[in-house]
Amino acid sequence: MDGKIQTSLRPTNTPWNKGRITGQKRPLKPKDVWAIRIRLQLKHQVCDLALFNLAIDSKLRGCDLVRLQVEDVCAGGRVRDRATIIQKKTGRPVQFEITEQTRASIQAWLPKVTARDGKYLFPSRFRAQLHLSTRQYARIVHAWVESAGLDGSAYGTHSMRRTKAAQIYKKTGNLRAVQLLLGHTKLESTVRYLGIEVDDALSISEQVEL
């Protein structure tokens, strides 16, 4: 030892989240959902409209949404009212509804999918035999929210998953129903996912006067 302080020659790593807004992504408000939907309709973006509507209805994680196959949501050339898939993360089944306007948008998109002889509902935009990647999906979501004048850094693919779930909870207060729709195994996961603990506590407190 020569008495000198030895300094590390390793380069300093920049934290991945430096300069980024992190944390839970916000759900879209109903007015934002309609703003995006109308823009997609006006621009005749058939694929994006089907993807957006199904993302809202299904409440699926991005990894499950992009892996959907035509046969998951269609039977005999018609779009189902309800569908069930096995979640990639948990290996458990989850069921979701497909509303009338979502069925119509998927039905409009189907001819282009079947024309490619593809099995995936949303094929990759670069390789037709593969499904849309989660990274591609994230970029699409970013474009959607910015087209509606929203801050792209505050929203993400989980915003699509949380949007309808948040509205269902807001209107019904039924956490168990939301848990089932999101495919969570524990109710605590749903509570954390919706970020409702503080809001609920304050709402209860506001109703008590002393």
List each model region and its residues.
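Conserved catalytic core of the tyrosine transesterase superfamily
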Residues: 1-210
